[in-house]
Amino acid sequence: MKVHIIGGGIIGMSTAYHLVKQGVEVVVFEKDPAYTESSFARSCGGFRAQYFTKTNIQMSKYSIDFIKNNTDVEFTSNGYLMLFGKDQKSDCDASTILQRSEGASTVAMTPNDVSSRFDYLNVDDLYRGCITTDGSEGWCDPVTLHKWYKDNTKCETLYIDGRELDHNLADAVVITAGCWSNQVGKQFNIDIPVRPHKHTVFNVSTAKPVIKDMPLVADLVTGVYLRPEGDGYIVGYDGNGTYDNKDLEPDWNSWDEVWEHLYHRFPTVFDEAKMTGAWAGYYDQSTIDNNAIIDNMFNFYFATGFTGRGLMHSPAVGLTLSEMILDKPTTFNIDAYRLNRHPDLEKYVI
């Protein structure tokens, strides 16, 4: 069996890895040899099981376990702290119940509990702070994980210049082209409802020493998320996204707003903060419900629309695509990811 994969980013290489393990001949087609525009290379690398839909939780748990137990990629298990405001009570309560029912060790801390454990946080406007207790959540280096897939996958990679290619010799064609999946799909008369959503991440230094054991903090009240990195922090913000892929110029003008949110939530940490750099990257955003699109039409398969979860779910998605292509039962129920699904909104995209 021969499979062509269009898109050699994190999803494409995970799919190649899982197929090659099953004895499939794979050719990967990639337009960006240095992966300079690839979304995985511009990710903050976060991994969490705290999601709002069942299959997303299951895929996260599988993927975290895969990376920790099957690769030599270093994983920083500082945790993933999600902060909910007082008007987000129902979402917090429902998601905590769902996550625990799926085996996640999520605990919902009161503001006093949050303050006792993380004394650098302002908790005045919080309802709860949620974190898992088993040390499973955290982050890894995205480029290192991608390299691990490539180093452990014996397949041919062809670097192309955007021209249309003849895939008639392939038994299956897989589209894993991120935010470009829609335009790739059109070459095969397939409409894949995904669009590019550009986000900016800032490098920030502070006058005080970095809090090395800080978890990745996702402030769902302000939309800011951050984690320690080297001698500073990397900070993202869901309020500075734009729907285009014209360029990768950061949204420098949003820094003042980001700093205000940082100072509000971390008053003793970012009181003397300095923005030292920034970069931008694309989410491949599903226009259906912010959940992934994993489906096939005859011998064309596609996985995209992860809206920031591609790196995080890459082991599970690669496994799923390999099972679909080889006509095996899928480990995960992907009905929620099919094109004809009933939308089930994944909330708080960060």
Task: Label each PLM-derived region with a short phrase.
Residues 2-27:
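N-terminal Rossmann-like FAD-binding beta1-loop-alpha1 element of flavoenzymes
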Residues 20-40:
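Glycine-rich FAD pyrophosphate-binding loop
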Residues 36, 170-215:
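Central helical "cap/lid" subdomain
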Residues 44-117, 223-225, 262:
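Dinucleotide-binding Rossmann-like beta1-alpha1 core, especially the glycine-rich loop
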Residues 73-82, 95-96, 102, 106-111, ...:
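Helix-loop-beta segment of a Rossmann-like dinucleotide-binding subdomain
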Residues 154-167:
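A conserved short coil-to-beta-strand element within the FAD-binding core of flavoproteins
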Residues 206-299:
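Active-site lid/adjacent beta-loop-alpha segment flanking the redox-cofactor pocket in flavoenzymes
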Residues 264-350:
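C-terminal catalytic lobe of FAD-dependent flavoproteins
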